Amino acid sequence: MGKIYGFYGGKFMPMHKGHLYCIDTAAKMCDHVTVIMFINGDDELEILKTHNEEMLSVESRIKQVERVCSLYPDMDFHIIDDNPLRGPDGKEDWDKETPLVRQYVPHMDYVFSSEPQYGAYFSRAYPEATHIIVDAERKTYPISSTMIRAMQILEDRKKWMV
């Protein structure tokens, strides 16, 4: 049997313990995992207007994800700027991102997320891969990046971050 390949992507805005749990799950199930961070200057500028924090900057997030990925010997990390791939309405167009993901992950056995609603897209974009949903109910780590950004107290946010 050949190597088992996995893929996990996100904005990691900010990187938190739920992301780490998903990455760790992928590393345990696969021989090699590719992690991709999607960045978009326009979206990020809007968020930074209301959350002027170093933890949300592109540079900070890249360092966080690189540090986590370096803990695993068979994991690589890439960045995709999806700003040029936006639709006319300015929204993300995952179908346009798929060929860029394929440049880094030409074959995958598993695609990891914590979002069941991503299943239809993953089935279409990566038909050879099984969608592994990690902690969808967020019982292990009851947190998301959106929830962290909504927290008013910095110490509350920091306890969830990596």
Residue ranges and their predicted role:
Residues 1-162:
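Nucleotidyltransferase catalytic core that binds NTPs
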